[in-house]
A protein has these predicted regions:
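Ubiquitin system architectures
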Residues: 1-104
Length: 104
């Protein structure tokens, strides 16, 4: 992974699912980011579940959230991270499936 990616803001701890590649998972609703170290064979659904547990522990259903890479939703979350086009240092966006109203 490049030095640039490791210098980006994220929580100090890393979620370790296995050895392989390091990606960032960003959740704009909570303005937070986690690093995930994962094997390239890990399904996106497992990465999503681990990141949700860390970023949004309010018992939200996995089905309420989508994972995006480069602005596009990853429609089949059962595929390995290596088949999504993600590379070491990529950032996945984890966000609500439906837009939520802004309250002031």
């Amino acid at each position: 992974m490049t030095a640039f990616v490791t210098s980006l803001r994220a929580r100090p701890e890393t979620i370790v699912l296995g050895k392989g590649m390091t990606i960032r998972v960003e959740m704009p609703e909570v303005w937070d980011t986690v690093r995930v170290e994962t094997p390239v064979t890990e399904p996106i659904s497992e990465i999503k579940a681990a990141a949700l547990k860390a970023l949004y522990p309010d018992d939200a259903s996995d089905a309420d959230f989508v994972v995006k890479l480069n602005g596009y939703e990853i429609l089949d979350e059962s595929v390995p991270v290596s088949q999504t086009g993600a590379i070491d240092g990529s950032t996945l966006l984890l966000t609500f499936r439906r837009r939520r109203p802004v309250r002031s």
